[in-house]
């Protein structure tokens, strides 16, 4: 019975299998960090975009604050204020949705390293706080705008009422003679019906001016009331954004508490290590003879090593 030695073939097969496994492992090692780096860069890009949008919204808020604090009627710019209010409201709604999506991305990456997840959660919490502060500032500015508009409307109504009282010829307490009396008018003859009342050109002009002023005031008041209603509806929508932010913050509360616990443990461990180092230093400082002995032994071994070599 003859035997065939196939040891060389077996060794060649093992070598080929090992090389294939090494190649696969190397590819995984190369692809893993690249994929992680890509995901990390994507998260960073989205977070940076949200942060830039929050900064741009803050700049618009500064401009809106300057316009809203103007109290005089001639410096008021209602159209520009309405445009800025609409833009800021849309930006806040978009930012709220983007942060919620970013939080879902963080939740979907739970299999990543703990340190990376912790960093991502901290970034999301920071963005939520920035958005909450921006929304609160926007709410305060809208409230200031509402107060100024109501005060301006009250002043306008008082001015119109005062002007109407002064211009009305029927309300004149200082004159006992009827202002409508015109001594140049012809007297009625006997048995003649005389029912015409001559107000004069000046009185008619005053009445026309007052009617025009009241019409303009009514239009202005309606515009003011419409603006106030829009601002109040915007404040109500901001309340919804605050509710969503509160929900997201409550979801992050457990993470923050866990981070605080880890921080306390780290501080405690650092304090314990510092105390142990101080104790060791004190023991070594009190035993200088041992230090000299150790130093002498080291020198002796060094000299012996030099002599031998």
UniProtKB/Swiss-Prot annotation:
Vesicular-side positions: 309
Keyword Acetylation listed? The answer is: no
**Which UniProt keywords are given for this protein, alphabetically ordered?**
Coiled coil, Golgi apparatus, Membrane, Protein transport, Transmembrane, Transmembrane helix, Transport
Start and end residues of each t-SNARE coiled-coil homology domain = 218-280
Q: Which SMART domains match?
A: t_SNARE
Q: State the coiled-coil residue ranges.
A: 37-66
GO MF annotations for this entry?
Answer: SNAP receptor activity; SNARE binding
Main localization category: membrane
InterPro entries listed in its UniProt record: SNARE, Syntaxin, Syntaxin-5_N, T_SNARE_dom
**Where do the TM regions start and end?**
289-308
Cytoplasmic compartment segments: 1-288
How does this protein sit in the membrane? Single-pass type IV membrane protein
Q: Which GO terms describe its cellular component?
A: cis-Golgi network; endomembrane system; Golgi membrane; SNARE complex
Give the UniProt subcellular location, in the record's own words. Answer: Membrane; Golgi apparatus membrane
Q: Which domain of life is it from?
A: Eukaryota
Q: What does this protein do?
A: Required for vesicular transport between the endoplasmic reticulum and the Golgi complex. Acts as a target organelle soluble NSF attachment protein receptor (t-SNARE).
Q: Which PANTHER family match?
A: SYNTAXIN, SYNTAXIN-5
Query: Its family?
Result: Belongs to the syntaxin family.
Name this protein carries in UniProt: Integral membrane protein sed5
């Amino acid at each position: 019975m003859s035997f065939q030695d196939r040891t060389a073939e077996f060794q060649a097969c093992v070598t080929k299998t090992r090389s294939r496994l090494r190649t696969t492992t190397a590819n995984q090692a190369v692809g893993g960090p690249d994929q992680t780096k890509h995901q990390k860069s994507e998260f960073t890009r989205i977070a940076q975009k949200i942060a830039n949008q929050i900064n741009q919204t803050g700049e618009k808020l500064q401009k809106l604050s300057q316009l809203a604090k103007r109290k005089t009627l001639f410096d008021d710019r209602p159209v520009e204020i309405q445009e800025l209010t609409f833009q800021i409201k849309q930006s806040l709604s978009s930012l709220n949705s983007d942060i919620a999506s970013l939080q879902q991305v963080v939740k979907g990456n739970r299999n990543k390293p703990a340190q990376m997840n912790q960093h991502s959660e901290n970034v999301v919490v920071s963005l939520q706080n920035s958005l909450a502060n921006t929304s609160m500032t926007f709410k305060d500015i809208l409230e200031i705008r509402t107060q100024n508009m109501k005060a301006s409307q009250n002043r306008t109504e008082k001015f119109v009422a005062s002007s109407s009282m002064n211009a009305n010829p029927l309300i004149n307490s200082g004159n006992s003679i009827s202002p409508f009396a015109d001594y140049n008018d012809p007297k009625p003859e006997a048995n003649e019906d005389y029912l015409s009342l001559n107000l004069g050109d000046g009185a008619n002009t005053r009445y026309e001016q007052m009617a025009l002023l009241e019409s303009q005031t009514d239009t202005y008041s309606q515009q003011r009331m419409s603006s106030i209603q829009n601002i109040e509806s915007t404040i109500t929508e901001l309340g919804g954004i605050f509710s969503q932010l509160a929900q997201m913050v409550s979801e992050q509360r457990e993470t923050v508490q866990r981070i605080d616990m880890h921080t306390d443990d780290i501080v405690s461990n650092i304090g314990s290590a510092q105390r142990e180092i101080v104790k060791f230093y004190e023991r070594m400082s009190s035993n200088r003879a041992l230090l000299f002995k150790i130093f002498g032994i080291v020198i002796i071994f060094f000299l012996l090593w030099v002599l031998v070599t």
